Amino acid sequence: MQSSSEHISDVLIIGSGAAGLSLALRLAPHCKVTVLSKGPLNEGATFYAQGGIAAVFDETDSISSHVDDTLIAGAGLCDKEAVEFIASNARSCVQWLIDQGVLFDTETSANGEERYHLTREGGHSHRRILHTADATGKEVETTLVGKASNHPNISVKERCNAVDLITSNKIGLAGTKRVVGAYVWNRELEKVETFRAKAVVLATGGAAKVYQYTTNPDISSGDGIAMAWRAGCRVANLEFNQFHPTCLFHPQARNFLLTEALRGEGAYLKRPDGSRFMLDFDPRGELAPRDIVARAIDHEMKRLGADCMYLDISHKPTDFVMQHFPMIYEKLLSLGIDLTKEAIPIVPAAHYTCGGVMVDQHGRTDLDGLYAIGEVSYTGLHGANRMASNSLLECLVYGWSAAEDILTRLPTAKLAKHLPDWDESRVDNSDERVVIQHNWHELRLFMWDYVGIVRTTKRLERALRRINTLQQEIDEYYANFRISNNLLELRNLVQVAELIVRCAMERKESRGLHYTLDYPDQIENPQPTILHP
């Protein structure tokens, strides 16, 4: 019998960004799909993506060039097979997006033909970024949300946080261990509900909220990585956290990202005295990969004792800047900064989680019936450093690939007959919520200071000791008090913080986004860092 707080579908998708919604739309003609969104439907990282989507649309470009650029940016740790798989399926997946109604910017060629306007970003040897001005993510997410919201086979649940996955062995079912559903905190009703499904997909995004400064929306708390780990899945390469080099330094807009496309179109990075510095660090200057640019900015800030560096595109024509970057122009103007006339104060900020839950080419994890797609996953695409505009692409390709696999397996997949309700009989309401707030701030501050852009073994050891103490406090709190949104996110962030530090301690070299003063050189024949539960 189905209880009032139980929901049943063929496929449960946890997350409502480009990965989750593209998968839902591909599945929906064939089965019943439930999509969980932590906040409003369009609140994920996809909505805020400014840059674009990398795909070969220019006849002078090639898939092999896209592959080579990605391998170079990944600093020797990309899985070449995964890179080739994604690059070779890029155009068809972008075309699917266009067919859904996404409008990318176009231009008129010299012979009068209309074609897509392609921009170039750091690490790319060709112009291959399709974009919608400087708000590509907003266009993609708005289109997918509109389609999903109106599809009769897609049920969307907003303001719902997954608490944990339910596995067959935990409820006494015989046979191979598999995922059978999830417990979900309904923030509107303030109660935990049960979701049953034949397949569960994690499309929960990354874990950048583990750091004090981040470009990500508030919901990026590593939920999927933590839940998969607790359910018995391996994770990989979590030491590689990308810090976006150019986040606006302003008290009223702490997580506003300034797209790489600004540098792609000629913006300079400058010291407070107006002098350029990137050519001192890399011959590619402002177009060097993000890890090099972020470290250079961090180095100059520390060397000069400066609060920030500056990004300057004021030497470009005003019309050009306003046409290409209208959203950024308006946002900065509202803060009293004129992009066309002055340099913008910037700092690096946590931006993207390159590692994640280990998956195969269809997004399958170690747990039967459980998939992970998008930023939550480790596919091997990004290696030690993600190249600009490859992330939305990965979401789309794995949304397609996972859908193919799920639809093949659904006819023989079994739905669990009954799942136990969430048990709150032995917990009370908390009278110490200040504990959560304190631990939250402490975690994000020491992760920024000790596990940030530049690391040392002592800093990592210090962070791990703090994490162990926090975990004990949070586990005790979780066992004794009713859950809340902040408690759920903190529990997951502390778990992911531990995994990040453990991965970082295992890598005895500096490579890509992982830079440690104790091991400044690269080793030969590097391997992914894989942790087993």
UniProtKB/Swiss-Prot annotation:
Keywords, comma-separated and alphabetical: Cytoplasm, FAD, Flavoprotein, Nucleotide-binding, Oxidoreductase, Pyridine nucleotide biosynthesis
Catalytic residues (UniProt): R290 (proton donor/acceptor)
One GO cellular component term: cytoplasm
Domain of life: Bacteria
Cofactor(s) the protein requires to work: FAD
Keyword Oxidoreductase: yes
Catalytic activity: L-aspartate + O2 = iminosuccinate + H2O2
Entry similarity comment: Belongs to the FAD-dependent oxidoreductase 2 family. NadB subfamily.
Keyword Translocase: no
Annotated positions for site Important in orienting the L-aspartate substrate: E121
Protein's recorded name: L-aspartate oxidase
Swiss-Prot/TrEMBL GO biological process terms: 'de novo' NAD biosynthetic process from L-aspartate
Cofactor annotation remark: Binds 1 FAD per subunit.
UniProt-annotated binding residues for FAD: 16-19, 38, 45-52, 223, 375, 391-392
